[in-house]
């Protein structure tokens, strides 16, 4: 089963469960230029420009979390790619999967801007840029 947490809830979960891994599934460009949560593991689910699924995704996750009972929190821009990635991990046998709702940037506002009404960065959680 895949659970959902808001960014503040995910941050509290990570503090309470040091064995958990936060996996940022966004593209390399998003991770580097938009920013990313501090201490997140970067494993792209899809990559720009063709948006094909990363065929090494599952192997890369297994490198950082070999134990299928490791709690894995997945984060993307707004919460959809991370959910897709979590479904694949669930099929692969991972049992503690959490989709971070709102993602890093949150949904678009009325002006078609992100980061104004949700997301990791909006909530003031620890993040950095490369």
Protein language model features and the residues they cover:
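Rhodanese-like catalytic fold shared by cysteine-dependent sulfurtransferases
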Residues: 1-21, 28-71, 82-130
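Short, surface-exposed ligand- or partner-binding patches at beta-edge/loop junctions that are enriched
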Residues: 75
């Amino acid at each position: 089963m895949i659970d959902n947490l808001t960014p503040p809830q995910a941050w509290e979960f990570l503090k309470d469960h040091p064995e958990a891994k936060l996996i940022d599934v966004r593209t390399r460009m998003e991770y580097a230029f938009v920013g990313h949560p501090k201490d997140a593991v970067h494993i792209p689910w899809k990559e720009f420009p063709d948006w094909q699924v990363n065929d090494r995704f599952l192997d890369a996750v297994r490198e950082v979390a070999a134990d299928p009972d490791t709690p894995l929190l997945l984060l993307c821009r707004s919460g959809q790619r991370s959910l897709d990635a979590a479904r694949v991990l669930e099929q692969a046998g991972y049992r503690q999967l959490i989709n971070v709702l709102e993602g890093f940037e949150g949904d678009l506002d009325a002006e078609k801007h992100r980061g104004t009404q949700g997301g990791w960065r909006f909530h003031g959680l620890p993040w950095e840029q490369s």
